[in-house]
Each structure stands twice: as structure tokens, then as C-alpha cells.
From Swiss-Prot:
Family: Belongs to the shikimate dehydrogenase family.
Record-given protein name: Shikimate dehydrogenase (NADP(+))
MF term (GO), any: NADP binding
Residues that span the membrane, as ranges: none
Chain positions recorded as shikimate binding sites: 19-21, 65, 90, 105, 213
Length: 271
């Protein structure tokens, strides 16, 4: 029951009405008996005032999603080492008025992959060098060989200081053959029938993960299934990164099975 002691959390982005994060986090608050609520904040412009509002209203923490994962940094008081290194934030913790930025995208992707396959020492190809792509590449480069392809090659090349190879999307056929794991870290496929990877480049046994979760079964994942690949939908990464955000805010380990279950139920209701 909402009362004067209820703590507020949320997600900032544009758009965020589609977000599954409120469904998952509110289920966790209920499970752990935490007097808190998680709501979407659609910020069409003026991110600075929105972040100032987090402080002014004593909002305990927010997730940050597209298009603000990089822009939000200049309005925060402190960054985790990972966020500092890659220039991306998706989780903000309000520590008594001090806003600290973290990134949980990378650990979310890594844990999702580890659920299905061996990650240590693998050859991993990531498409996209935006906020999520950078975070995923940085985290996975700690234990694997990582290549990032991007339309703007300069953005991919900036990751080379972490031992990551950056190249153009035009090199896709060569690197797909090299890869054990392929990750789409772009928004291509979100609410559209598009795939950056043609079906003929895929092969049996290749692990294919898409960070897009609307639709859950993207065109890329359908291609992967048809070619005998191991297909991992974007909801797995979402629940694992959400569980890590929940831990940063509350100190509790998020229940990924519960998070996925309530998210799937919500998606089914809206088909």
C-alpha cells in the first residue's frame, strides 16, 4: 500500500511506455516486502531538469534507457569505474542526494549468455557501439575475444583501448564466420521485420542473442532458429541487468525467474 514512507524508483527514457521494467521491479518489491514503487518517466527533452527532479523529489534510483545512456553522465555526481571507462550509464543510485551512475547492461548480457553457453575464451561478435553495445563489449572483453561492428566505424574503433577490435558493418560476413557468439546490440528489429544479419550467414551451433525484446522473437532470432543456432531473446538480458540494478538499490538479489515470468505474462496479455 502506497503511503508517506513509500520509496520511489523509475525509468527515464523516450519512449518508455513499452518498458517491462515497472512490471519486473514492482513484482520484486512485493516479493521482498519492500515499501516501494517503480514507475516510468517519459522524458521527451530537458534531461537535466529530469535528473534534478530525481534529487529534489528524493527518488531513490532510476534506470536510464535510450536515448539518454550517454547524455545522462554530465548530470551525475559520481560514476562507477565501468561507467567511467565506457561512457554509458543505465542505473542511477541516489545516495542521500549524491547521484551515482552504474552500468548493468554488460553484466546482464554476460549472465544471460552464461545461462546458455561458455563465455570464457569465446569469440564474440557484437553489432552496435551505442550505450548498450559498449557496455556489453567492455564486460565481455574481460573474459573473451570481442569484435564490435558499427555503421560509424569511429565509434567502434574507440573501444580498441580495451583490447576490443572495432570495424565496419561491411565486414559482417568475415566476422560471423569467426564468431562463436553473435549479439545484436542495436535497435534494429524493434517493432519491425528487419535483421542486420542475413539468414545465409548463420550456421548450426552459433549462439545468437538479440537485446531487442519487443517482439520477443525477432526476425534475427527466427533466422537463427531456422539455421539451427542457439537463440537467446532480449528478455534474458533485461531480467539479469534489472536484477543487478535491484541489488544496487536494495542490497537484495533479484529473482530473475520471477522477473521473466511476470514479464512474459504481461507480453502475452498484450499480444
Amino acid at each position: 500500500m502506497i503511503n508517506g514512507e513509500t520509496k520511489i524508483y523509475g525509468i527515464i527514457g523516450n519512449p518508455v511506455k513499452h518498458s517491462l521494467s515497472p512490471i519486473m521491479h514492482n513484482a520484486l518489491f512485493k516479493k521482498f516486502g519492500i515499501n516501494a514503487i517503480y514507475v516510468p518517466f517519459e522524458v521527451k527533452k530537458d534531461l537535466k531538469n529530469a535528473i534534478n527532479g530525481v534529487k529534489a523529489l528524493d527518488i531513490q534510483g532510476v534506470n536510464v534507457t535510450m536515448p539518454y545512456k550517454e547524455e545522462v553522465i554530465k548530470f551525475l555526481d559520481e560514476l562507477s569505474e565501468d561507467s567511467q571507462n565506457i561512457g554509458s550509464v543505465n542505473t542511477v543510485v541516489n545516495l542521500e542526494g549524491k547521484l551515482v551512475g552504474y552500468t548493468t547492461d554488460g553484466i546482464g548480457a554476460r549472465r544471460a549468455l552464461e545461462r546458455f553457453t561458455q563465455v570464457d575464451g569465446a569469440n564474440i561478435l557484437i553489432l552496435g557501439a551505442g550505450g548498450a553495445g559498449k557496455a556489453i563489449a567492455y564486460e565481455l572483453s574481460k573474459v573473451a575475444n570481442v569484435v564490435v561492428l558499427n555503421r560509424t566505424i569511429e565509434k567502434a574503433k574507440r573501444l580498441e583501448k580495451f583490447g576490443i577490435v572495432g570495424d565496419s558493418l561491411e565486414a559482417l560476413p568475415y566476422y560471423v564466420e569467426w564468431a562463436d557468439i553473435l549479439i545484436n546490440a542495436t535497435s534494429v528489429g524493434m517493432n519491425e521485420e528487419k535483421s542486420l544479419v542475413p539468414k545465409n550467414l548463420l550456421r548450426p551451433g552459433l549462439v545468437v542473442m538479440d537485446i531487442v525484446y519487443k517482439p520477443l522473437n525477432t526476425l534475427l532470432l527466427r533466422y537463427a532458429q531456422e539455421k539451427g543456432c542457439i537463440a537467446i531473446d532480449g528478455l534474458w538480458m533485461l531480467v539479469y541487468q534489472g536484477a543487478e540494478s535491484f541489488r544496487l538499490w536494495t542490497g537484495e538479489e533479484g529473482d530473475v525467474e520471477l522477473m521473466r515470468r511476470v514479464a512474459l505474462a504481461w507480453l502475452r496479455e498484450r499480444k
